[in-house]
Amino acid sequence: MVKLVFARHGESEWNKANLFTGWADVDLSEKGTQQAIDAGKLIKEAGIEFDLAFTSVLKRAIKTTNLALEYSDQLWVPVEKSWRLNERHYGGLTGKNKAEAAEQFGDEQVHIWRRSYDVLPPDMAKDDEHSAHTDRRYAHLDSSVIPDAENLKVTLERALPFWEDKIAPALVDGKNVFIGAHGNSIRALVKHIKRLNDDEIMDVEIPNFPPLVFEFDEKLNVTAEYYLGK
């Protein structure tokens, strides 16, 4: 059976500080680096061999991908980076402490912004220091494509073309695939893979560790789903 392994990036410095991160390019914490290394070791123990890998354009996912491949002795595997695998854009919440945001806007409102499938958080100002509109890595994109805020619905809409153009064809071709990405971009793809409805995906959480494995038949029907080491 062909395998797809999702690894959410290890703990980031902003995860550690309980801040909304989104598209902010935050590095891994010491714990997160170790989680990525341990992910690679679990992959090696499981004997999973990859043909190609995909990740976002954010360093926490890129470093997780590189470390996981290195410690599974597969650092040579081709890696393609795409903004379509980025974390959900948290808009004006980016950089805010989650507890302080709850105090400012109310627990219920922040919960809706975080967990609702189709409610958008406040937009990020285009002159914000974390705005993608002035970030060189997105210079090739039309400005109308660059988000100022996203919910899970929008995250899936921008990740889905990459799934259909790159990931799914590789799986159909019998290739084992590694994806180093983010909690919400992985959740969005899991919703599509498992054909979950809008309510069912709200209860799905993706931990920083360990990696999540899907096995598929030739028609991309899920035949197995499990976390490595569990």
Swiss-Prot record:
**InterPro entries reported for this sequence:** His_Pase_superF_clade-1, His_PPase_superfam, Phosphogly_mut1
Pathway per its UniProt entry is: Carbohydrate degradation; glycolysis; pyruvate from D-glyceraldehyde 3-phosphate: step 3/5
Q: Which family does it belong to?
A: Belongs to the phosphoglycerate mutase family. BPG-dependent PGAM subfamily.
Residues that, per the record, bind substrate: 8-15, 21-22, 60, 87-90, 98, 114-115, 183-184
Q: Which GO terms describe its biological process?
A: gluconeogenesis; glycolytic process
Q: Name the reaction it catalyses.
A: (2R)-2-phosphoglycerate = (2R)-3-phosphoglycerate
List the SUPFAM superfamilies: Phosphoglycerate mutase-like (SSF53254)
Q: Which UniProt keywords apply?
A: Gluconeogenesis, Glycolysis, Isomerase
What HAMAP family does the record point to?
Answer: PGAM_GpmA
Q: Would the keyword Repressor be found if you checked this record's keyword annotation?
A: no
Question: EC number(s)?
Answer: 5.4.2.11
Site annotation (Transition state stabilizer) points to: 182
Q: Provide the function of this protein.
A: Catalyzes the interconversion of 2-phosphoglycerate and 3-phosphoglycerate.
- Organism per entry: Streptococcus uberis (strain ATCC BAA-854 / 0140J)
Official protein name in the record: 2,3-bisphosphoglycerate-dependent phosphoglycerate mutase
Matching CDD domains: HP_PGM_like
- Pfam families on file: His_Phos_1
For this UniProt entry, the molecular function terms from Gene Ontology, in alphabetical order, are: phosphoglycerate mutase activity
Q: Give the active-site positions.
A: 9, 87
